[in-house]
């Protein structure tokens, strides 16, 4: 989200590897617009042309757009956003779009840079929207590696920590423990191939098909707005707001740390609704991060999360736990995947797969429909247009904006020999080198994946252009089942499936994200060459930064413990999907498979109903993917996010324009401050500096026992 996926896109809400992928894409358009609000509509109503407003400003060459300051700023922001995305991936997997924050902070830091240089008389090059787009692309592609790298899903799912939580395939053949060296190598091998997969198709997708790529378009409107006098003034106010809430969030996280000397200590374990509710994970944990995430995510996502938490932890799990001794053995520990934990994990997987299958069929259907329209009209000068595939006359007169954008977009060609040659060379290198890192992943598995990947990448990019949904994680899960079953359990099939997931997910997701970035560049007159180079440099940054950030978390915290601060929930789910593909379902407890079938079908049908009913009704129907996330984790973070929605709702009710302009800045500040505290917290942990206090809450009876014990 992700590769640059985390980046562009109504998923980029949220499975750090899964729901992050799909739901984030469902959310980003609204989030990426951020302060723009209804800017697209306003632009059409107020100004006849965006590009005429910039007509007196020369467009720098593609080399001039690639400045040192852009990549210095990009590097600094990449570190910050990698920390934030990594923390989100390893806690709940709910990752919102950070496009607004990246664009806003990139704009602010370079403006600060240019103002300082200008004062001493050394300013040689003004800050342009093209350079802003380069920064945006670099940052998003860098922190996208924290998502597509699978640190909260397939990659850490290979580890012994997660394998011990599963009941099968936990032998050495199916385990690969993380180490910084091989992780960086793995990232470099799998992250770049997708950049070359669809480069030859950029003219077809952007100019000929006129695909909208809503997230890319929204980001372009945002950047164009920053570089008008009015937009620059608003951006300064937004940055001040972001800085204010960043400071509040960071200081609050620092204050909380003093009270977390043991397990279940501190404000994050505050039994807001009572101790019984706390046992079922119903509480508000005072996390600024998830209040901020809730302010960015659409209302329906946050409501879906809360509904999912109530259905699972309020109804289903308490009822199933009463069947202990009947449906599963009484003696099993709570974390055993032969007991209650199996219902939590596999019913969640069933909902994710049901939702994913439906959206795969839906987006694939849109893609086929677009091709049919194009074929029918190939001799009548019409082309399918983005939103609904309806034909638009190709001979109708182009607007000034379209002429200007087409001219510059087609000016700096990326040679097809470079794109095709790059893909082939990288595919060969990866096929030869990946087995050195993961011997179970044979070279011919990788080669087969790379042969079919461009077709899947094209379908995904086309569907993403139509609907703003990237199904990269769905293609990744498909690879888990196909390659895991091919290899078999005795030949490391679980490890093969997880690694193949990474290969496929990176190619398909990165190709789609690059098209989103090309769309942003198209609308800001940034050269495709500068966009491509920025994406390559940003990805290279991410391949180093993301593993280093993960390693810091891995060495500092107990990652993967289901009851810890960093449970990495999707790691166990991805590993169990791989086990499912290799071994089947024979070991599941009683009625677990039946409930999984029901959950799978329910997710499919709810999505179908949501698309069939009128929009005024559909907007109130929960999203199954979002509802599934708290099935495993509990509803505590959903309560935080719902609070974010409540804050934003009342703000919009009081002053809608102000809320639309400053809501994303407040949310970004809350997320960035709390997220960035993880860095000094990790450093303190590494040097054995521990919190001095433990704040815990006990029932009256438990407190009396403690007093009696201490009194003796």
From Swiss-Prot:
Keywords: Membrane, Transmembrane, Transmembrane helix, Transport
Disordered: region residues: 25-48
GO molecular function, one term: oligopeptide transmembrane transporter activity
Compartment(s) where it occurs, according to its Swiss-Prot or TrEMBL record: Membrane
Main location: membrane
A single GO cellular-component term on record: membrane
Transmembrane segments: 70-90, 93-113, 138-158, 180-200, 242-262, 300-320, 345-365, 418-438, 446-466, 478-498, 532-552, 593-613, 631-651, 666-686
Pfam family, one: OPT
InterPro entries xref list: OPT, YSL-like
Membrane topology field: Multi-pass membrane protein
PANTHER family, A to Z: METAL-NICOTIANAMINE TRANSPORTER YSL11-RELATED, OLIGOPEPTIDE TRANSPORTER YGL114W-RELATED
Purpose of the protein: May be involved in the transport of nicotianamine-chelated metals.
Stated family: Belongs to the YSL (TC 2.A.67.2) family.
Protein name, UniProt field: Probable metal-nicotianamine transporter YSL11
Source organism of this protein record: Oryza sativa subsp. japonica
Name of the gene encoding the protein in the UniProt record: YSL11
